[in-house]
UniProtKB/Swiss-Prot annotation:
DNA-dependent RNA polymerase catalyzes the transcription of DNA into RNA using the four ribonucleoside triphosphates as substrates. It comes from Shouchella clausii (strain KSM-K16). Zn(2+) 1 binds at residues 60, 62, 75, 78. It catalyses: RNA(n) + a ribonucleoside 5'-triphosphate = RNA(n+1) + diphosphate. GO terms for cellular component: DNA-directed RNA polymerase complex. It holds the Pfam family RNA_pol_Rpb1_1. Its EC number is 2.7.7.6. Zn(2+) 2 binds at residues 818, 892, 899, 902. This is DNA-directed RNA polymerase subunit beta'. Keywords: DNA-directed RNA polymerase, Magnesium, Metal-binding, Nucleotidyltransferase, Transcription, Transferase, Zinc. Its cofactor is Mg(2+); Zn(2+).
Amino acid sequence: MIDVNNFEYMKIGLASPNKIRSWSRGEVKKPETINYRTLKPEKDGLFCERIFGPQKDWECHCGKYKRVRYKGVVCDRCGVEVTRAKVRRERMGHIELAAPVSHIWYFKGIPSRMGLVLDMSPRSLEEVIYFASYVVTEPGDTPLEKKQLLSEKEYRAYYDKYGRTFTASMGAEAIRKLLADIDLQKEVNALKEELETAQGQRRTRAIKRLEVLEAFRNSGNEPSWMVLDVLPVIPPELRPMVQLDGGRFATSDLNDLYRRVINRNNRLKRLLDLGAPNIIVQNEKRMLQEAVDALIDNGRRGRPVTGPGNRPLKSLSHMLKGKQGRFRQNLLGKRVDYSGRSVIVVGPNLKMYQCGLPKEMALELFKPFVMKELVSKGLAHNIKSAKRKVERVQPEVWDVLEEVIREHPVLLNRAPTLHRLGIQAFEPILVEGRAIKLHPLVCTAYNADFDGDQMAVHVPLSAEAQAEARILMLAAQNILNPKDGKPVVTPSQDMVLGNYYLTMENANARGEGSVFKDSNEALIAYQNGYVHLHTRIAVPVASLNKPTFADEESNMLLLTTVGKLLFNEIMPDSFPYINEPTASNLEVKTPEKYLVPSNTNVKELLKERDLVPPFKKGFLGNIISEVFKKFKITETSKMLDRMKDLGFKYSTKAGITVGVSDIVVLSEKKEILDEADKKVERIMKQFRRGLITEEERYDRVISIWSDAKDLIQSKLMGTLDARNPIFMMSDSGARGNASNFTQLAGMRGLMANPSGRIIELPIKSSFREGLTVLEYFISTHGARKGLADTALKTADSGYLTRRLVDVAQDVIVRENDCGTDRGLEVTAIKEGTETIEGLYDRLVGRVAFKTVRHPETDEVLVRRGELMNEDTAKQIVDAGVESVTIRSVFTCNTHHGVCKACYGRNLATGSDVEVGEAVGIIAAQSIGEPGTQLTMRTFHTGGVAGDDITQGLPRIQELFEARNPKGQAVITEIDGDVVDVRDGDKREVTVQSELETKNYSIPYGSRLKVAVGDKVVAGQTLTEGSIDPKELLKVTGMGGVQEYLLREVQKVYRLQGVEIGDKHVEVMVRQMLRKVRVVDAGDTGILPGSLVEIQRFNEANKKVLLSNMRPATGRPVLLGITKASLETDSFLSAASFQETTRVLTDAAIKGKRDELLGLKENVIIGKLVPAGTGLARYKTLGIHSAHDERAENEEAGTPEEVLVQD
């Protein structure tokens, strides 16, 4: 048996007839399967035991030899070898075909490989193979040409005329003769000569032919092997036949297809023996050809063969294809043992790294561990009695279970797993009941709620798996979101509300201005009702024990509230005292304005002071980031647990409720609406007089109503009491926002009709007042569209993620530094005047390519090759530097991956990326996961020139698939000045540079962006709209396209409020640009017109340049992610993605080697993935658990000094 962890590559090729015979254990001669009476396999049939091995372990067909002691004996009566039954999964048979048959993949695929080799059209091939025409194989000395097609009539005429001086024949036999006659070397040389002169279609055809012929020449495959003499029969266990309850049999479709082949083959043999007339033999040969076609790929040609109920039969190709095929169903994703699933409920008292596991579930999952422990403790005599104990659930089992579970993490997963935080490890705590308890803070990462969601539990079995789960996957380790490096475990809903309530301030509350000797005294006063949580009080700075206060401040008083004292108790000791929600308070220290001398009259002072706003959701997130930066993981997770407990406690104490009386309707609403109605009437008058067009009228009406709604919204927010429960909910960020509130108390505003156009009649009522019937009806459009969109969006977004993962799965951090000599210059990304992504965001966590100096003082801000953290980036931005050159994935030279320096910081851990990190997968997940939050719609902005801007998910797909965008803009190919803009029947823009002048015709309906006298640079847009990236590539080269795609993707996500790290998009775009189309091969021997990886292209050129020969020339191509995935070097990865048969056909002809560099290939063949701890360098490491060591020590009789795992 092959050892999966020990082979270097996997190769695929065409099988020669002899190879097929060498695989086989015997010929299948009969179409029978099993005997209907004895249910034993028929001899020489499709399930024959002599060929494929015994059905029962160590037992021959006739029963002469039973038991393992006869291992390896071949029975003299029935000829069956005595061995294990599982050999029936690996032994193959064969069928000797009475006539050669063409393989449908090579004849029918697009392009037809047989057609390319023979230089015949697929149409004529089909006529020959299916016995409609003769083909001349040897013209002899007749005027006929080789490969000329003759109809039956013509053949007769020529035969009568020339007799046997020429040969022409039909069927796959003729094709095989033609294939065998080909001299590959001669053909290749002829084609290379032709390429030097050929143009257009002829050139394209020649390149395609050359590619196939070269493939045959280099791979050692014979072209004639595309025609089969022998057909392999796959092992019977892979096409099983099973008995159902009613005595009927269910069988794999392959058996039916094989039976048809065998029947027709046997009939053909008989006809040939009888010397039947030619026409009958030909018909039988055609039927045999069709039967083999159906077996290999049913439905590829003609009508598919159907089984009972007109269902097409599943052929060998269908076994591989699609979601249910071998690749995606069994090789890339398998069902696993030691798992369970149940409904989740909230576990507010769990620690960050814990989850509640139902007792009975835990017992079932950890059964083998419990049984082993029962035996080793002497509570059961053997495994069998231990098993019985566990199944009867005897009392001592629970104690053992507690022990087994104590240090054993489990994995919790919620589907859909959109990013790596969808599976995390927890320490299980046994709970009563049947629901899994989940920590409330990890819900965001899982996108889980408790309305009936279910989660699956998996048990890591080996010591290695447990160590990885504990060190890498524990929930407390995954505080940052890999997509942007911000905390993903921010408190939500009740927790936010509780902390908001806790840190509120009230003027003139009970006991305002009291001074207490320390926080304990203040708390006692609060518990006894002397002060309120919101009362502004003072405490001595010295009593707080905070090292961030200066020595001279220690005898002053700090103005704060009781709630804030409580809130600060959960923070680490050396963290600044947080008194106001500002960045400087977090990063530096408490602002001095809250410190007053100890003899101050606090009560009087407070009367003049404004109230400090409470801490909202965003600020809590900043606190977590800051704590993480200063104190790392353990401290942060402890602080998070304390923040959660505080939030729950005080949102309960606050007793915030919502009633109808909390929704106050605005008194000035009527006036605002009347005013708007008057404006609309004025517009209508202008329209009726013909002063404005229909479009302008519509636009103005819409803008009047949206302005009215905005006005109502701002007035509402102004009149609200800060203690209004609904306002508190939306202001704190717990639930809802200003626009929800406007709909409740103000007006609902404008709605869109089903086609997405805004109806100009607004909904004037609010929910508090109630909608009229018409208003309600109009509202339903939007609601229904929302639900339909969500359903479609989920599928689209999931498919996008799958394509992204596929294209980037082999991008792994392979080395420390690739030593590239190029960097990427970054500036803030802007859209008009609005900044989409600031320079700060683009610098944090990246390595500087050049030393950056302060523009005024010339002081070094960051050295070349240094990683920029938050502080450095802030200094650079504050110094007024506008552009910085950084190391980027775009310019990385590492083969099959990236290097540490070009990637920079790993956003998920906040520290340097490690060698072996699968950054491609992380990038794909980070871009795909927020996909569900993007909108589906194409915005139709009204206006005179209505242009459709594609946004949201469709725009992202358009960018990553490198499609021609909707509403394409015209771009200039040269730098220069706009010298002329012609408007009229033919709109034109003329750009002039020093060397040339170019005219660009502007399509009707496009809006111009340039005017005469503007300076333009190559690749700049002349009209509004999106650029076609393929055009841009021709004009600006790779740099321009990379920059454009990065900017556009960021724009879509940022406008939806989703932040994604640049480096993720860079990884994807780099994968789209990794190929070059060879224009002229020079002396490199690369085929012209082929797609080659940039690195391979450069290496080939380096070699020929060193020998003073001619290098190849090529131009970079931009591939969409689907195309890029299929163009990958690994055929296993491509075949398991899409177009399985095409990829495998191609790979077999080329005799491709898969070097197993990516993740998918290794998952498919069952090796460890070459990333993370699966890297070769970790293979030699062994893992000792304390448990094994204790056992060894006891055996050796040494004193028990045990190394415990960290």
